A protein has these predicted regions:
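Conserved glycine-rich cofactor-binding loop
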Residues: 8, 15-16
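Substrate-binding pocket helix/loop in short-chain dehydrogenase/reductase
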Residues: 93-94, 98-106, 189, 201
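Active-site helix of classical SDR
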Residues: 117, 154, 162
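Short, small/polar-rich loop/turn modules that mediate ligand/substrate recognition or access, typified
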Residues: 83, 170, 175, 231-233
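Residue(s) in the substrate-gating loop at a strand-loop-helix junction
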Residues: 138
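Alpha-helical segment proximal to the catalytic Tyr-Lys
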Residues: 122, 167-171, 229
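Short C-terminal tail/terminal secondary-structure segment
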Residues: 143, 221, 232-247
């Protein structure tokens, strides 16, 4: 089914991992997807994108560059959806995190998300469909994790931002939701876990395996489709039951 035929949108962090998979899932459903990343191309050698995925090189923390990019896409094609997926982390005990590292995580994971939402706002408001924003949060917005406190802080902020924008922009015909990934094979997850921690995580989860990145794409596709018309201000965990596990 081509549920997203006729829709155009932007996804950040689209060169690899969850963003790359989501961009392709959306494109396969008929959308034209502008996948923004620092490299402007698929990260893994030999990896190809759907023909509807257009890779663009840009730095989400460069507001001038992102302003020019959104203006060009918005004027030429319109913007029906935005997926804020780009994110970074640093692995360090909280007391050892430098001011520069803390500020960089918040700059990329929070400030740039808010800025891109506001840059896309006039085009989302004009969309013939209800405009859609999907922010990628994390289990870390709901749980505490050692050695990644700046990341946890940033994702909690994005969750609150999602709810605030959903309330404020509902009158403008824009739905704002978020998706909280659990454990997926990605460059970021490899940075924060060794093999011992990986096995402990898998043993604890109700579904004892990491997710397929396309699982995130499927949830994002639903949230930018017409099937989610009455859903806004919500956070959807795609995590193999990780957030549901009790002691």
């Amino acid at each position: 089914m081509m549920e997203l035929a006729g829709k155009t949108g932007i996804i950040t962090g689209g060169s690899s991992g969850l963003g790359f998979a989501a961009a392709n899932v959306l494109a396969e459903a008929g959308a034209v997807v502008y996948a923004v990343s620092r490299s402007g191309r698929p990260k893994l050698e030999g990896e190809t994108s759907h023909e509807n995925v257009i890779h663009l090189a840009a730095d989400v923390s460069d507001y001038k560059e992102m302003g020019e990019l959104t203006e060009r896409i918005g004027h030429e094609h319109g913007i029906d959806f935005l997926v804020n997926n780009a994110g970074i982390t640093v692995k360090s005990l909280a007391q050892d995190v430098s001011d520069a590292d803390f500020e960089k995580v918040l700059q990329v994971n929070v400030s740039s998300v808010f800025k891109l939402c506001t840059l896309c706002y006039p085009y989302l408001r004009q969309s013939p469909h209800r405009g859609r924003i999907v922010n990628i949060t994390s289990m870390a917005a709901h749980l505490g994790f050692s050695e990644v406190v700046p990341y946890c802080t940033s994702k909690g902020a994005v969750l609150s931002m999602t709810r605030g924008l959903a309330v404020e922009w509902a009158q403008d015909g824009i739905n704002v939701n978020s998706v909280a990934p659990g454990w997926f094979p990605s460059e970021m997850s490899r940075k924060v876990m060794d093999e011992e921690r990986k096995q402990k995580i898998l043993a604890r989860m109700p579904v004892h395996c990491f997710g397929n990145p396309r699982d995130i794409g499927a949830m994002v596709k639903f949230l930018v489709s017409d099937e989610s018309e009455y859903i806004t201000g919500q956070d959807f965990a795609v995590d193999g039951g990780a957030l549901s596990f009790g002691y």
